[in-house]
């Protein structure tokens, strides 16, 4: 019995490869190469609307009523910016953050984005965006950006959010930055 346990222990303790390859490494692909890798039903077609440099690390997107694509992008993810980088106590802007909500538009009608507006900048992992605005504003959206759910609005018509209003929050995010806008 002891010999069987010893043999079993030694067999299970056999050395494993130090760094098993779990994911096949590949170099970066162009958007066109990525498109060729899609598998879609016969009646479907995939078209490229936007790629880098217009967008970078998109995390959420939604089409607005004016036919424009609203995209939240984050460089901070998965680590939220600490409070010492917040511009104010509400967390309305983060110093040195490249997280933003951008609006992409097809101006010339060729089916591809050719205009991008950085609508709201200095955000903190904006994982949700819903294009919507009050009638008195030119444009706007409801978005989650740590630590609140915000209403961002363009009140002047320059394409930039000059109003940042907390709708709900603040909410805890210290343990997990996922799904706060669910």
Which residue ranges define each predicted feature?
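Beta-propeller domains with acidic blade repeats across secreted/periplasmic ectodomains
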Residues: 15-182
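Bacterial N-terminal signal peptides
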Residues: 2-15
């Amino acid at each position: 019995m002891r010999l069987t346990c010893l043999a079993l222990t030694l067999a299970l303790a056999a050395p494993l490869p130090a760094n098993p390859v779990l994911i096949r490494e590949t170099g970066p692909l162009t958007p066109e190469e990525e498109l060729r890798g899609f598998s879609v039903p016969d009646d479907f077609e995939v078209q490229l609307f936007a790629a880098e440099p217009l967008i970078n690390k998109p995390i959420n997107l939604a089409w607005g009523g004016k036919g424009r694509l609203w995209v939240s992008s984050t460089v901070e993810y998965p680590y939220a910016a600490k409070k010492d980088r917040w511009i104010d106590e509400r967390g309305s802007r983060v110093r040195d953050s490249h997280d933003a909500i951008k609006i992409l538009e097809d101006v010339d009608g060729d089916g591809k984005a050719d205009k991008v507006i950085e609508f709201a900048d200095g955000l903190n992992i904006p994982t949700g965006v819903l294009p919507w605005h009050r009638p008195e504003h030119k444009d706007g959206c409801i978005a989650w950006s740590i630590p609140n759910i915000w209403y961002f609005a363009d009140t002047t018509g320059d394409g930039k959010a000059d109003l940042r209003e907390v709708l709900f929050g603040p909410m805890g995010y210290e343990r997990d930055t996922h799904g706060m806008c669910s």
